[in-house]
């Protein structure tokens, strides 16, 4: 089953599900009052916001093979916490699909982007 990390990854998740012939399901209840976690000023704030932001629906993950689709991965810390949380629900497998190009360099135009060392894609060989 394909599950989007709400909200901006939904179109890609539906397209991937259609291409694979796999159902695309809503796997999370999202708190609409939380902001984008990757631009928050420090890791403690990002962690607290993520705990409030996404609540997984147990029945969607328990015993299922899941392809988790997200729009981007910046530091990797948000995805790490999501996967850690989902593992407590005993899925058969968790796979990831990130549909944007790798973020390898900081952006200095007003968004709190980390240094190159903090960007997960800058540390990976392709």
Identify the function of each model-found stretch.
Residues 1-126:
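PRPP-associated nucleotide enzymes
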């Amino acid at each position: 089953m394909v599950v989007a990390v709400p909200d901006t990854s939904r179109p890609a998740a539906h397209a991937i599900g259609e291409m694979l012939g796999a159902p695309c399901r809503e796997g999370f209840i999202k708190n609409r009052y939380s902001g984008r976690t990757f631009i928050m000023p420090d890791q403690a704030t990002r962690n607290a916001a993520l705990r409030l932001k996404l609540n997984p629906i147990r029945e969607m993950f328990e015993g299922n093979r899941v392809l988790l689709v997200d729009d981007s991965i910046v530091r990797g810390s948000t995805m790490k916490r999501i996967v850690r949380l989902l593992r407590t629900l005993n899925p058969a497998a968790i796979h990831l699909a990130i549909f944007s190009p790798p973020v390898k360099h900081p952006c200095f135009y007003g968004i709190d982007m980390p240094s190159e060392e903090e960007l997960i894609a800058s540390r990976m060989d392709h």
